[in-house]
Every structure is written in C-alpha cells, then in structure tokens.
Regions:
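N-terminal capping/small domains of soluble enzymes
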Residues: 1-60, 222-227
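Glycine-rich, proline-tolerant flexible connector loops at the mouths of alpha/beta enzymes
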Residues: 17-43, 79-92, 120-125, 149-160, ...
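A structural motif
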Residues: 17-18, 72, 113, 145, ...
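Active-site beta->alpha loop and helix N-cap motifs at the rims of alpha/beta catalytic domains
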Residues: 20, 25, 45-116, 121-133
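Short, electropositive alpha-helical surface patch
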Residues: 33-45, 126-143, 166-170
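Catalytic cores of alpha/beta
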Residues: 60-67, 128, 132-136, 186-201
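Catalytic alpha/beta core domains of metabolic enzymes, predominantly
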Residues: 154-157, 161-227, 237
Length: 237
C-alpha cells in the first residue's frame, strides 16, 4: 500500500538517518507509481528528495519518463555487469549495450536527473569476463554518472574475492564512487560488506534485518556501521 511505503520511507530517512533509499522499480504498477509519488511529495517538502531513488532499466525513455513523472530525480539504472548477462540475457554485443546505456544517461541528464548505475552480476563479470567490466567502465566513466553500484548478484563471492575485485576497481578508477551490493546466499553478506569497506568502497547497500531480494541482503546494523565510519570516513550507508 502507498501509505505503508511512505511510513517506511519516513522511518528510514527521518528517524534512522539512512543516507539513501531505493523505494521502487519503474513501470511496475499504478500502485507503485502512486507510492513513489507520495514519497517524493513528502520528501520534497522536507528537502530530502535527493535521497530518494528508483530502480530503472535500459529501455530508451520509458523508465526515465516514469520516474520523472513521480517527482523522483534519481534513477538507479540497471546495466549488465557481466558478458554472460549481456550476451545471453540481452542478446546484444557489448558495443550495443554500451550505446543503449549512454542514450538513457543522456536523456536522464536532459531531464535534470541524477544517474547511478548498477553493474548487475558484477561479481561473475570480474571472475569470468573482467575485460568486459573494464570496457563498460571505461565508457561510462566519461559521463557524469554519480555512483557505480557493484552487485554480487548471485551471492557467490567470499571476502577475499571482494577485497581482490574491489581493489582492482578502485585502483583502475580512483575517482569513481563505488557502492557494494551484497547478497546473502551463503551467509557471507556481512563479512563481504566489511571487506568492501576495507578495500575502498564508499557505499553499502543494506536492508532492515536482512530482509530483501531473494536470499536477502546485508542486515542494516546502524550503530555498528556508524562506528565503522569513524575508522573509514570515506564510506556511506
């Protein structure tokens, strides 16, 4: 229900002081549209609108228009972070996918929207096709994308792999802002997000009590994470 979503968003942003909330996916339903609009109307009145985000897709103008119409001004664009996802799911070449992404980014910028990007399946991309990941990043780094969000989509990484892959990203793209998006398939989400922070990651995606997508994301342990910030001030949650 839209009012329930608004209540949760208010709790997260005002009481728990969460930095950002991704409140919906674009194009899901009229009910989701109404909920996002209600949240954005409330957030705008409290100068919190830049902290409200919506997941969007590489679909031309469709997701951007949907999100913009709700009043939201931040799109988290879902891109393919592995060659396997690009070729088998989209059935496109890397060049075609990059061209499609850049087109959406340009259009979102024309609407005065902030763009973050997910590199979906980034973990397997780094394991199996790192040259694809770097090729994609090389192209996207030329834009004004604000955050690059690196998901362990299937929850297959261990902390040592997170350290290795995150350090490679930070070393190659020192000016980029990287978020890490863990999944908890093998009960490693918390250890993996700590490894990401130690490796230079600047943002973490978490959920209340670990509830979330599929096997769950990393639990949001607010006070512990805030203490971590004192030691690693570059990180945001």
């Amino acid at each position: 229900m839209p009012h329930e979503k608004l209540m949760i968003a208010r709790l997260l942003l005002e009481e728990l002081k969460v930095d950002r909330v991704e409140v919906a996916s674009a194009r899901v339903s009229e009910g989701e549209f109404d909920a996002v609009k209600m949240i954005c109307d409330w957030a705008a009145r409290r100068n919190l609108l830049p902290r409200v985000e919506v997941l969007g897709f590489v679909d031309g103008h469709t997701s951007v228009d949907w999100i913009h119409a709700t009043g939201c001004r931040v799109i988290n664009l879902l891109c393919k972070g592995s060659l396997k996802h690009c070729t088998y799911q989209l059935k496109k070449t890397p060049e075609e996918h990059i061209e499609d992404i850049l087109s959406v980014v340009d259009y979102a910028n024309e609407q005065d929207m902030v763009v973050n990007v997910y590199l979906e399946d980034w973990s397997n991309g780094m394991k199996d096709s790192p040259e694809y990941v770097f090729r994609l990043m090389d192209a996207l780094e030329q834009t004004n994308i604000r955050r690059y969000m690196l998901p362990d989509t299937l929850g297959v990484l261990n902390p040592l792999q997170v350290i290795e892959f995150m350090r490679k990203m930070v070393k190659r793209y020192p000016h980029a802002h990287f978020d890490f998006h863990a999944h908890n398939d093998y009960d490693l989400a918390v250890s993996n997000v700590l490894a990401a922070v130690l490796s230079g990651c600047k943002g973490l995606h978490t959920t209340i009590n670990g509830l979330g997508e599929r096997a769950g994301n990393a639990p949001q342990v607010i006070e512990f994470m805030r203490k971590m910030v004192k030691r690693y001030p570059h990180a945001h949650f």
